[in-house]
Amino acid sequence: MTIKREMRNDKRAAPKAPINENISAREVRLIGADGEQVGIVSIDEALRIADEAKLDLVEISADAVPPVCKVMDYGKHLFEKKKQANEAKKNQKQIQIKEIKFRPGTEDGDYQVKLRNLVRFLTDGDKAKISLRFRGREMAHQELGMELLKRVEADLAEYGTVEQHPKMEGRQLMMVIAPKKKK
């Protein structure tokens, strides 16, 4: 036996506002096409006004008593809403976590290059994860790693704040710095 299933889109359609003859109320509070309050009118009168203007009657607020309806071009209204949603989505910034790896014996030249990269990450608005890996006998000198991370923290104080203080995870010492909020 086969079971027939309906195909569904992954994007769920937003519940659409009732328009024109789909409005179930007998009386509505009507807002005209130019935004002025017409008042409380029967649904037939509201449909006639919308028809004369060659526009749609759209239910704006179904919860109100009586429901609020507006005379507008429904297709244009949907287009504007979609355009605003796309604009809001485009203006969002994804925050990423960038990682820089140090070693307990990192020399000054390498330290400056890595510090410059950390400054760039923080000024771009990304979080920075600083990891310091210990190998072999270096585990006996974890205080050197803590000193290095404290130095990094002091050098980056004007660009960011420590979100996660240095802590050991296995053979790695980790710290996370978040960018300072822009005023």
Swiss-Prot record:
Q: Which UniProt keywords apply?
A: Cytoplasm, Initiation factor, Protein biosynthesis
Q: Which gene encodes it?
A: infC
Please state what the protein is called: Translation initiation factor IF-3
What domain of life?
Bacteria
Keyword hit for Cytoplasm? yes
List the SUPFAM superfamilies.
Answer: Translation initiation factor IF3, C-terminal domain (SSF55200), Translation initiation factor IF3, N-terminal domain (SSF54364)
Q: Where is the protein situated, by its record's location annotation?
A: Cytoplasm
GO molecular function: any one? translation initiation factor activity
According to its record, what are the GO cellular component terms? cytosol; membrane
GO biological process assignments: ribosome disassembly
Biological function: IF-3 binds to the 30S ribosomal subunit and shifts the equilibrium between 70S ribosomes and their 50S and 30S subunits in favor of the free subunits, thus enhancing the availability of 30S subunits on which protein synthesis initiation begins.
The entry sums up its family as follows: Belongs to the IF-3 family.
Which species is this record about?
Answer: Pseudomonas putida (strain W619)
Question: Do you know which InterPro entries this protein is assigned to?
Answer: T_IF-3_C_sf, T_IF-3_N_sf, Translation_initiation_fac_3, Translation_initiation_fac_3_C, Translation_initiation_fac_3_N
Q: Is Nucleotide-binding given among the entry's keywords?
A: no
Q: How does it assemble?
A: Monomer.
Q: Major location, coarse class?
A: cytoplasm
Q: Which residue ranges does UniProt annotate as crossing the membrane?
A: none
